[in-house]
Structures are given as C-alpha cells and as structure tokens.
Amino acid sequence: EMQRSLVGSEMCIRDRSCACIQVSKVGFRGKGSGMVANRAYKFRIYPNDEQKILFAKTFGCVRMVYNHWLDRKIRQYEENKTNVTYTICAKEMAAMKKTEEYGFLKEVDSIALQQSLRHLDTAFQNFFKQPKTGFPRFKSKKRNKNSYSTVCINGNITISNGYLKLPKIGQVRLKQHRIIPDEYRLKSVTVSQTPSGKYYASILFEYENQVQEKEMRRFLGLDFSMHELYRDSNGKEPAYPRYYRNAEKKLAREQRKLSKMQKGSNNRNKQRIKVAKLHEKVSNQRKDFLHKQSRQIANAYDCVCIEDLDMKAMSRSLNFGKSVSDNGWGMFTTFLKYKLEKQGKKLVKVDRFFASSQTCSVCGYKNAKTKNLALREWDCPQCGTHHDRDVNAAVNIRNEGMRLVNA
C-alpha cells in the first residue's frame, strides 16, 4: 500500500558515468533521422582550500536535505497515509532557509539542494516501479560517496580556459583531457569526492546527432562466465585479469593495519587514504579493460545479444559474490550498450529464464542434466553434437536475439 501511495511526479537526470566519456541517454526519432543524445565527460578538478570547504558544506547540506525529507515522507505516510510531493518539499525547504536555525543552507548552491529533493523523489519512483531496488535509505557521511548535482541555468555553469565555473564555488581548475564540440549544450554537473580525497566533475551535455540505424547483419551472442568475463558465440573469450583477486592480499594487509590504528590520528588518516587509493586502482584497471573490450565488440558487430541477468541476486550468492564484483558484468553491459547505440546498433537482452545452457544449439534438444553447473562439456543425445557449455549457451543466446530482432 505504501508503494502505491508515495509516488511522486518529478524526474531528474542523474549522472551514472563510470568513465571519462559516456552516452547516458539516447533517443531515436526515427530510422535515419536525428538523434538526441546525452554525453557525460568526467574530468578531475583541483579546488583550492576555500573551495574545498564550500564543497564539504554543499555535500553536507545536500545529505541533510535528503535525509530530512526522507524522514518527513515516512512520518507523514505513517500518520495519515498520504505522500509529500516534490513541490511541497521544495516550498518547505524555501521556508526553512529563512529561519535562523537553517540559515546555513543559503551558503550553498540552491539548485543542488533542489536536485537532492528530486533524487529522493526519483529513488521512491524507482522503488515503486521495481521494489527489488530497495526502499530509499538515509545517507551516511561515512557510508555514502560525497557528491552533489547542479543544473545549468542561464549560463551559471561554464567551461573556459581550463576552469569550470560553478554556482557559489566560482572558478575551479579543471584537467580537460578532451575537446568539447561547440554544438554540445551543457545540461548539468555532478561534483564528487573519492575516499582518497580526489575531486571530479561529471559534466552532462546534450547534442543533436545524425545516426543511421544499421541493418542488423553481424550478430554476436555473449554468455557471461565466472572465469573469463564471457564466452562469445564464436568460441572466443577475453584474457581477463582478475584485478580484485590479484590485489586482495595486499588490500587485506593494509586494511588490517588501518583497523589497528587509533581513530582520529594523522597516521590512521594516511593509512585510510592508502587503502582508498588501492581500491581506486583496482576500479580504474577494471574500467579500462571493460572499455577496451566493449569498444572492440561494438566496432565489429551490429547487434550483440546477452542474457538479462539479475546482477544483485548473483552478487548476494555465496558462490558468485566476488566473481560477479570482480568481473563487472553490469558495468560492461552499460559500456557496451551506449557504444552500440552511438553507432545506431543494438544490444538485445534475452529473457533470464531462457534455457540457453540446456538447449542443443544444433537440433534444439533440451538436456536436463546440464542444470548441473559442474558439467562443462556434453554430447547431445539426439544429434550427437559435442558442446562446450558456455559456447553452446552463447550460440543459443545469439539465435534467440536474432529471432527477437526479426520478429
């Protein structure tokens, strides 16, 4: 009942960029016609000491606003079964800023505070559409990443001569490693701080692009693998380095050192940054590898077919947890999707209950014995074809994807 009652109406653009450059939203207007696309560039920024203080204040205020109205929504529903809409929350926040107790909210970007309310509203909408995403949680200073989003209105955000101008912050030095085309329109910026203390700005642009939808001729099926990221329908697999597994012992050793140090000491803070940098290195190595693999596939094929896997459920599995996290299937899928769409190509997801591993890709016979995951190779009892479990599954996924595209 609560899920049906707490539905809001406002939506927002949230930066989900994992890389330096990403198409985060694509809208086709028709075959061979113009395409409206959003592209996000992620640049490192170097704030001065005064700007770092302002960023810290903004992170804190955004978190406080989110938590305050999350509590407000929950209490109102418990009292009279009604919802507090985004509009009501925004009006209450405007009044709150005029009080002496909450006057500090005026010191930070007002749009960032509004975006925090929109993010809360979106979190509820996502929960109502898909309860498995989980009920919105209160944000913690320690648990959550420091970040806030702001929107470009009347030129309040600009990039010029190696500097990014942000509301209330001013000119922040920017490491711009890519040229931004003149026709790109700046839409929003998400500022974030990593656990190691680095600052980044993910800048979202909108642009018009003429993309000719490709004729689907070259199909590829991918079966995600615990050992080598995936096996494709041609029998190939990438030589995937297990970055987290390789760094696990070193991470554990440094984490033990951190746990033994006195809280609040300078040495503990130095060790905390050291551990954070190790995690960042693993993450960056994984992203680099996944970007290169997804680029090779997107350039070589017109349509890529994969299984629609439940990544969260697999991560919670006792047997699959570390493998799923280390492989980064979800991230790889995201990278592959936007790279294909940018070229007018497609990523097709096959139903997760499709029996790709049990079905013979030659004659269609279903072999129930293959439900045993330990069975890596098998011979079809009907046609006698010898199968590698993963390659056979990838071929079936490709064939099912072709059927869906041509249906």
Ranges and model annotations:
Residues 1-15:
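Single conserved hydrophobic/aromatic residue that forms the stacking wall/gate
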Residues 14-407:
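Nucleic-acid substrate recognition interfaces
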